[in-house]
Design a protein with these regions (language model features):
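Bacterial N-terminal signal peptides
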Residues: 9-18
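Short beta-strand segments
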Residues: 54-58, 106-113, 145, 188, ...
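Chymotrypsin/trypsin-fold serine protease catalytic domain
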Residues: 128-220, 255-256, 262-270
Length: 276
């Protein structure tokens, strides 16, 4: 009970920061095997030794073997893992199933060896350093090609060339799907399906990529609770440009995604991965 209480205290704390952290890609379709490198992150919250689909923490992606060959690296957001030590959680589990809520729960679970996050996480709201890694045993991820990371300054180069705004991206993740204008407000459902949806880049700052997920305005899909740490792919490629960090509480307007091509992001990622 103490472990559960600490976990929910951590969740409530996250909900109090200036924007709502985002824990499935809605407005799209079941992903099937389009993005097999996108996985779901779990923790054994009730301590029963069995992982349920409802113990989903976040989404993330397989980024390849570590530079030293010691681990397979699962990339996610810092806020997906930073709460764990204070809640007594010492291990995470990753599944690359495209559905994690069947009767047997997620299958092919890989238990972490360790996990880490950017030590500067949450120190600066302008650059949240919202990057984390879950370190899996070397060679444990098989038959799945990793995502590609972007070169340094990739998005700045697109902006300088005048081609950034409106660039097509693909959103992929697990988690909740919102239904708006319901009695009592927005309602959320969870079926544990990995989904993919289309998006377009709206803007860029030093640390963030923004896109508009107002479906009535754009026709695009969006992200919601369950998607934290999920990757944004440059459409038609395996290159990811950012990971999901936060958005509005109704999962209806803007979304904030942490860039992977900046000096600060690369400083952390370079501790674990060979960078382009």
């Amino acid at each position: 009970m103490r472990k559960k209480a600490l976990f929910w205290a951590a969740v409530l704390l996250l909900l109090l920061i200036p924007f709502t952290t985002v824990f499935a890609a809605w407005g799209g379709e079941p992903d099937g095997n389009q993005h097999p490198m996108v996985g779901a992150l779990f923790a054994d919250f009730d301590g029963d030794g069995a992982i349920s689909g409802f113990e989903l923490v976040c989404s993330g992606s397989y980024a390849g073997p570590s530079a030293d060959g010691a681990y397979d690296v699962f990339l996610t957001a810092a806020h997906c893992v930073a709460w764990a030590p204070s809640a007594g959680i010492t291990q995470f589990f990753v599944s690359f199933d495209n559905e994690v809520l069947d009767s047997d729960g997620p299958t092919n679970l890989i238990g972490s060896v360790d996990f880490d996050w950017d030590p500067d996480f949450a120190h600066d709201s302008g650059d949240l350093h919202d990057l984390g890694v879950v370190l899996l045993p070397a060679g444990s991820v098989t038959g799945i090609a990793p995502v590609q990371l972007p070169p340094a300054g990739y998005l700045d180069d697109l902006k300088a060339a005048g081609t950034l705004k409106g660039t097509a991206i693909e959103l992929v993740g697990y988690g909740l799907v919102p239904t708006w204008q319901q009695p009592g407000g927005t309602q959320f459902s969870f079926d544990g399906v990995r989904r993919t949806a289309a998006g377009t880049i709206k803007g860029l700052t030093q640390a963030w990529v923004y896109f508009n997920q107002n479906q009535h305005a754009t026709g695009d899909g969006g992200l919601c609770f369950g998607d934290s740490g999920s990757p944004q792919f440059l459409a038609g490629t395996t290159m990811i440009i950012s990971i999901t960090s936060g958005g509005d509480p109704n999962c209806r307007a803007n979304n904030y995604n942490y860039r992977l091509d900046t000096e600060n992001a690369r400083a952390f990622l370079g501790q674990y991965l060979a960078l382009p």
